């Protein structure tokens, strides 16, 4: 897989957003590039292959030049051709990984990039609770939107796409002595467990363990159910993976600092 990564990477350090299995490019947009940084850093650590670290460093050069310095975090998801939360969240996580395995000025440089991207990512997150009308399911079950992130300017709902971002915030809080970052990580962590269905608290979900993907908190929707309800679009896999990362903190840092 990593050999394929090296083959796909462009000269400017970016990775194409969409490609076929024969490596022909469908969408050359580089907004998804930070998603490749994480496995490359992990691959370097596990296989001791410096090519993977060199590739990860090249992605950071692209991220700094085209995303972070311009505050232009775009099209990280496959279904949104626009600014989205995921691009800034993963840019912060990518440079966080690189800062964990570097020292001195290089470490500081990546840490500064992480901080800049993280603050932008935080602009997607709610600091208040959106009101719901009586009879709307989310309001009736007491759903609080603080700590949840909006998805993109195209897909205007909230979700639990967070993965290691709370870890990033806690680390930045220690690195820069900014307690408000770890404080908000705690808000995210406690708020995103609200809709986890268990016996006696099913949250409108039919089965224990499933977690809703599209949580609709505005009058905008995909045309299904509307504000205060879940959409019937449902990808149960990534929601569980995201929460798994959120509620097993410190995994990347523990592995990368062995």
Spans of model-derived segments:
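Glycan-recognition and catalytic cores of secretory/periplasmic carbohydrate-active enzymes
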Residues: 1-258
